[in-house]
């Protein structure tokens, strides 16, 4: 029986990539800086002390981080009891966004640029907004700027409730984000609006990676908070991903947990399981691992690292999240059978100590555990697509166009 358990720790970078200078991210190091802040006692909100992640250490994260940056994370040394193969990978996609990272992991790097809304104010062209307003029968929008999602609902949420005008905003990523109140605007209305925006963007050749529904609740700016009902309406992959190949060539199953299905536009997904919160995502993953059949990929994205702690520059929260995940990792490891592969990686960085609120261009860990495979150092992988190619070889699929087998 062959099964792959692929877990993406969203934004868990381990040091700036060779091309980080093009993104003003030289020196960024999501993992390393979290470890440093914990060691120095500067990440003690809701937790305390040095970062405690024994299971990630056992899978080789410390050694991988050292190979990525040239030095061990503060307070750690070489781990001799590693049970997995470990390495690190750099991205060849042109962006440092979720879609690019995940598609490249699945063997389809995004080499051309996405369309970005670069203006900080009046970010979306009036002609585009007018098309959306006409088709959606809205009275208008508010926002139309670069913004943090939590900040903009605090600032404009009350006006949105009063006027029923959706809040639209973007970031340095290729995204069109829409925030609406679940009760006063309606969740189904928000999803319908996002589908309309996705259709119009595609119709008029705006190569925008994602339209994101950002629902929130609360009665005033002191109470507004985003809910777990976020949805991403992604552009469809340009080529066949390894998850689609598994279904097409082996009639296999791809179980998508969290926002994975949204990232691939539902393409190459057999079963989509919506799950929110780090603990619940881990529980759902464990549940699906226990019943996974032959030729199955269980594919989980742990979004909280990025959305709750990376973008919000919350070092303590990120550290606490890593420790929570590590506490669930022992059970995950115990479920991996002789011919299975457990792969832990990330899609980009989001250093919570870095300037601004955006992603950081970083190398990502590649940790592969299987009781049936001899452990070794995987080296510096030149593309995330090596993960997709490795999965293709493992399932005896036709070759992917990018990447090399690591095993």
Curated annotation (Swiss-Prot):
Compartments where found: Cytoplasm
SUPFAM superfamilies: Alkaline phosphatase-like, DeoB insert domain-like
Source species, domain of life: Bacteria
Protein keywords: Cytoplasm, Isomerase, Manganese, Metal-binding
Pathway note: Carbohydrate degradation; 2-deoxy-D-ribose 1-phosphate degradation; D-glyceraldehyde 3-phosphate and acetaldehyde from 2-deoxy-alpha-D-ribose 1-phosphate: step 1/2
Molecular function GO terms recorded: magnesium ion binding; manganese ion binding; phosphopentomutase activity
Principal cellular location given in the protein's record: cytoplasm
Reactions this protein catalyses: 2-deoxy-alpha-D-ribose 1-phosphate = 2-deoxy-D-ribose 5-phosphate; alpha-D-ribose 1-phosphate = D-ribose 5-phosphate
A Pfam family assignment: Metalloenzyme
Record keyword Metal-binding present: yes
Entry note: cofactor: Binds 2 manganese ions.
Binding site for Mn(2+) 2: 306, 311, 359
Cofactor(s) essential for the protein: Mn(2+)
UniProt record, GO biological process: 2-deoxyribose 1-phosphate catabolic process; 5-phosphoribose 1-diphosphate biosynthetic process; metabolic compound salvage; nucleotide metabolic process
InterPro entries: Alkaline_phosphatase_core_sf, DeoB, Metalloenzyme, Phosphopentomutase_DeoB_cap_sf
A GO CC term attached to the entry: cytosol
Its EC number(s): 5.4.2.7
PANTHER family attached to this UniProt entry: PHOSPHOPENTOMUTASE
Family, as annotated: Belongs to the phosphopentomutase family.
Protein name (Swiss-Prot/TrEMBL): Phosphopentomutase
Organism: Buchnera aphidicola subsp. Acyrthosiphon pisum (strain 5A)
């Amino acid at each position: 029986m062959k099964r792959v358990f692929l877990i993406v720790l969203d934004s868990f970078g381990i040091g700036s990539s060779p091309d980080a200078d093009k993104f003003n991210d030289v020196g960024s190091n999501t993992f390393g800086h979290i470890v440093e802040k914990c060691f120095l006692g500067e990440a003690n909100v809701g937790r305390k002390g040095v970062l405690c992640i024994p299971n990630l250490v056992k899978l080789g994260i410390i050694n991988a981080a050292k190979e990525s940056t040239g030095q061990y994370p503060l307070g750690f040394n070489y781990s001799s009891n590693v049970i997995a193969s470990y390495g690190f990978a750099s991205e060849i996609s042109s962006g440092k966004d979720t879609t690019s990272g995940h598609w490249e992991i699945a063997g389809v790097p995004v080499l051309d640029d996405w369309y970005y809304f670069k203006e900080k104010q009046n970010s979306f062209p009036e002609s585009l907004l007018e098309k959306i307003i006409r088709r959606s029968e809205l009275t208008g929008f508010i926002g139309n700027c670069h913004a943090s999602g939590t900040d903009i609902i605090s600032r404009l949420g009350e006006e949105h409730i009063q006027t029923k005008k959706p809040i639209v905003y973007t970031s340095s990523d290729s995204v069109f984000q829409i925030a609406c109140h679940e009760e006063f605007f309606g969740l189904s209305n928000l999803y319908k609006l996002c589908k309309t925006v996705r259709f119009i963007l595609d119709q008029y050749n705006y190569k925008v990676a994602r339209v994101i529904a950002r629902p929130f609740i609360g009665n005033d700016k002191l109470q507004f908070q985003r809910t777990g009902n976020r949805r991403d309406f992604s552009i469809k992959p340009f080529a066949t991903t390894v998850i689609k190949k598994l279904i097409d060539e082996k009639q296999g199953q791809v179980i998508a947990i969290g926002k994975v299905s949204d990232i691939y536009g539902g393409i190459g997904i057999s079963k989509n399981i919506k799950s929110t919160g780090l603990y619940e995502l881990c529980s759902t993953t464990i549940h699906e691992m226990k019943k996974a059949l032959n030729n199955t990929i269980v594919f989980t994205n742990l979004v909280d690292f990025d959305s709750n702690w990376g973008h919000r520059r919350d070092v303590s929260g990120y550290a606490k999240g890593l420790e929570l995940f590590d506490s669930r990792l022992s059970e995950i490891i115990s479920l991996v059978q002789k011919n299975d592969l457990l792969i832990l990686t990330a899609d980009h960085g989001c250093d919570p100590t870095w300037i601004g609120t955006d992603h950081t261009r970083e190398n990502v860990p590649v940790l592969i555990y299987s009781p049936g495979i001899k452990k070794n150092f995987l080296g510096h992988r030149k593309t995330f697509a090596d993960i997709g190619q490795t999965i293709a070889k493992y399932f005896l699929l036709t070759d992917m166009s990018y990447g090399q087998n690591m095993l």
